[in-house]
């Protein structure tokens, strides 16, 4: 059986978090690739889509997340990226990924910060997630709700030292959910193809 090609894009929640374990959960039938750099803002991730276009071309699934950098309000005068611009950039990213021949597209919602992390308020995170999910669903993007998953036990899933990144336990839990969604989505997409269109 031909290996399924999977690409992971995203910020540090991916890079030093769930992304470290997805390949293990998916197993030997999947070829998982991800950049070794942080995707940071949604706009930087869009740039990565260009830089890594050869890796992305023909991928059976591209799983992506961005938002922590965008919604951050360090100075008290508003987030780095306005919500409307954030959503527009995600939509542009989806459009480019489709042009590059990527198959199933999966967006992971932005994870919540710990209590007292004012520059990453849970309310603003939820607001950005709602806007992104509403827009991306219309484009056929599958949603991996990491916000909902991590919100079930922030104390266990968000590191107390920085109130932002995933604990070791959360890395595994998020990776398992991510791998399950990727595998199920690729299987479902394959079932929709006619015999003559199979890769």
Whereabouts are the PLM-identified features?
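Conserved SGNH/GDSL esterase-like catalytic core that processes O-acyl groups on lipids
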Residues: 2-92, 165
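Glycine-rich phosphate-binding loop signature in dinucleotide/nucleotide-binding domains
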Residues: 54-58, 100-101, 185
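Active-site segments of SGNH/GDSL-like serine hydrolases
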Residues: 65-71, 95-127
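Short, structured coil segments at secondary-structure junctions
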Residues: 26-28, 101, 139
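Alpha-helical scaffolding segments of alpha/beta enzyme cores, especially the outer helices
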Residues: 85-88, 92-96, 127-134
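Catalytic His-Asp segment of secreted/periplasmic serine-dependent ester chemistry enzymes
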Residues: 110-199
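Basic/polar N-terminal segments that are highly enriched at the extreme N-terminus
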Residues: 1-3, 198-199
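Conserved beta-strand segments of alpha/beta enzyme cores
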Residues: 31-33, 104, 140-142
């Amino acid at each position: 059986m031909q290996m399924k090609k999977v690409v992971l894009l995203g910020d540090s929640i991916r890079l030093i978090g769930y992304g470290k374990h997805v390949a293990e959960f998916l197993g030997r039938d999947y070829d998982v690739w991800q950049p070794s750099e942080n995707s940071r803002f949604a706009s930087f991730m869009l740039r990565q889509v260009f830089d890594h276009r050869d890796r992305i071309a023909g991928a059976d699934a591209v799983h992506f997340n961005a938002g922590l950098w965008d919604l951050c309000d360090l100075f008290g005068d508003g987030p780095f990226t306005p919500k409307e611009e954030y959503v527009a950039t995600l939509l542009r990213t989806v459009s480019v990924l489709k042009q590059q021949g990527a198959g199933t597209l999966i967006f992971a919602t932005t994870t919540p910060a710990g209590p007292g992390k004012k520059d990453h308020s849970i309310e603003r995170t939820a607001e950005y997630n709602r806007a992104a999910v509403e827009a991306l669903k219309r484009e056929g993007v599958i949603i991996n709700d990491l916000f909902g998953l991590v919100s079930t036990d922030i104390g266990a899933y968000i590191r107390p030292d920085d109130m932002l990144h995933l604990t070791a336990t959360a890395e595994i839990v998020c990776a398992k959910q991510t791998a399950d969604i990727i595998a199920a989505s690729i299987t479902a997409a394959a079932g929709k193809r006619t015999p003559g269109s199979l890769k």
